[in-house]
């Protein structure tokens, strides 16, 4: 690690808690000093000494077109020339809303926010207002932002009311949140049998991108939809990570499930700060000014993010875009798996559309993880070794074994081959250790 980078981190720690503005950036999970970046272009991100890294984080998902895409940058420059924020309705937010509703059939109306956390927080408030119920259900290992109701883990029993995972969250808030195992249809049935008439909503990542990448069974989703419908609960898909990433229609299109509400993140603004939640018209009509559920934001639907999103959707909706993106992921992940197998490394992978996951499992008999407990059983030290080996070779992966990877359309065959070659070298070293 360069002395300059260590100096930057020390300087940051003087006035920024932990030296970062989001905990995962601190490299606490993998060890070492975080790298400070100052620019990016295409498939690559550059540190402050202008060393290039092939980037598979993509600002945690939204850089699906690659960094600094000319069309997006041009749209943002033109938007900035016209004024940064108006605090009024604009035609641009209507265009983005129309486009999302056209692409995602379950979304009949949509409201813009400034972040994914705002989107999930608002969707839950809306579900509670719509149903006139208090309890919400979430799943172990799913992350939905840092609002108080969602920073909750399972209690001592599987169907207990949750307890906070963060200091500063009152127990009175947490008592309304029920946390159950992910990808477990029976747990859903048991939960509704016990609490059904009190449950306002169930919120989940339809593909979990915050426990690396766990793809649940079709039965899991079918059970969720059936139980929510039977008990009058609102089904909320948090597609902040999967929306427009695993496919144009998101995870809900992949599974053929229509949620009642869907949350989106910064991908709809091509990486600028933005979020959204939308769904059935009768539910969305409960939002102010039409209904009694209050939600607002000075920067919601800001013109820079909306105009960037309009430019991005032009490419996402082009014929063959997701076929090409998926082929790149197949190339990378299949190469990883082949290299791991060659050297006897116990690695399992998942992939769909532009997302992928890698798990260093304990032994050759262990299959790909199916839930949070499975992920926590993986070899975190081996992942850390892999992460730093890749970083030393100019490959930037998420600095956590619990985060998914992302491909952009700008990753070239040369980028992918270089990444596979680096992985092969590290696996060879691991095999000798």
Curated annotation (Swiss-Prot):
Pathway, per Swiss-Prot/TrEMBL?
Porphyrin-containing compound metabolism; protoporphyrin-IX biosynthesis; 5-aminolevulinate from L-glutamyl-tRNA(Glu): step 2/2
Tell me the GO BP annotations in alphabetical order: protoporphyrinogen IX biosynthetic process
What is one GO cellular-component annotation here? cytoplasm
Subcellular location(s) per record: Cytoplasm
* UniProt keyword Cytoplasm, yes or no: yes
| Residues recorded with modification N6-(pyridoxal phosphate)lysine | 266
Q: What class of enzyme is it?
A: isomerase
For this UniProt entry, the molecular function terms from Gene Ontology, in alphabetical order, are:
glutamate-1-semialdehyde 2,1-aminomutase activity; pyridoxal phosphate binding; transaminase activity
Sorted keywords for this record are: Cytoplasm, Isomerase, Porphyrin biosynthesis, Pyridoxal phosphate
**Which family does this protein fall into?**
Belongs to the class-III pyridoxal-phosphate-dependent aminotransferase family. HemL subfamily.
Name of the protein in question:
Glutamate-1-semialdehyde 2,1-aminomutase
Whichever gene encodes this chain, its name is: hemL
């Amino acid at each position: 690690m360069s002395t300059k980078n260590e100096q930057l981190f020390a300087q940051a720690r003087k006035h920024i808690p932990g030296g970062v503005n989001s905990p995962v950036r601190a490299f606490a999970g993998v060890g070492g000093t975080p790298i400070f970046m100052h620019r990016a272009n295409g498939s690559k991100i550059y540190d402050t000494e202008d060393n290039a890294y092939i980037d598979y984080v993509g600002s945690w998902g939204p850089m699906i077109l690659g960094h600094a895409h000319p069309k997006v940058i041009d749209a943002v420059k033109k938007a900035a020339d016209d004024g940064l924020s108006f605090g009024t309705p604009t035609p641009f937010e209507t265009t983005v809303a129309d486009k999302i509703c056209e692409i995602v059939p379950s979304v009949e109306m949509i409201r813009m926010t400034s972040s994914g956390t705002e989107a999930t927080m608002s969707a839950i408030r809306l579900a509670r207002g719509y149903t006139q119920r208090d309890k919400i259900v979430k799943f172990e290992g799913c992350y939905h932002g840092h609002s108080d109701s969602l920073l909750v883990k399972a209690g001592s029993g599987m169907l207990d009311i949750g307890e906070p995972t963060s200091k500063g969250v009152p127990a009175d808030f947490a008592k309304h949140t029920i946390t159950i195992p992910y990808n477990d249809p029976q747990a859903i049935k048991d939960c509704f049998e016990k609490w059904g008439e009190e449950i306002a909503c169930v919120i989940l990542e339809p593909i979990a991108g915050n426990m690396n990448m766990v793809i649940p069974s079709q039965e899991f989703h079918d059970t969720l939809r059936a139980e929510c419908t039977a008990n009058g609960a609102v089904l909320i898909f948090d597609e902040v990570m999967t929306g427009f990433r695993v496919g144009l229609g998101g995870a809900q299109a992949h599974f053929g499930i229509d949620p009642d509400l869907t949350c989106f993140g910064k991908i709809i603004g091509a990486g600028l700060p933005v979020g959204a939640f939308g769904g059935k018209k009768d539910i969305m009509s409960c939002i102010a000014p039409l209904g009694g559920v209050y939600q607002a934001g000075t920067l919601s639907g800001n013109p820079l993010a909306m105009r960037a999103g309009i430019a991005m959707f032009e490419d996402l909706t082009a014929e063959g875009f997701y076929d090409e993106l998926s082929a790149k992921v197949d190339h990378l992940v299949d190469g990883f798996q082949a290299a791991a197998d060659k050297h006897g490394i116990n690695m399992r992978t998942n992939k769909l559309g532009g997302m992928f996951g890698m798990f260093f499992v304990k032994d050759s008999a262990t299959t790909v993880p199916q839930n949070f407990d499975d992920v926590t059983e993986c070899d975190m030290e081996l992942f850390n070794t892999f992460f730093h080996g890749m970083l030393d070779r100019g490959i930037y992966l998420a600095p956590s074994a619990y985060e998914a990877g992302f491909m952009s359309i700008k990753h070239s065959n040369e980028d992918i081959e270089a990444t596979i070659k680096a992985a092969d070298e590290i696996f060879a070293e691991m095999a000798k250790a």
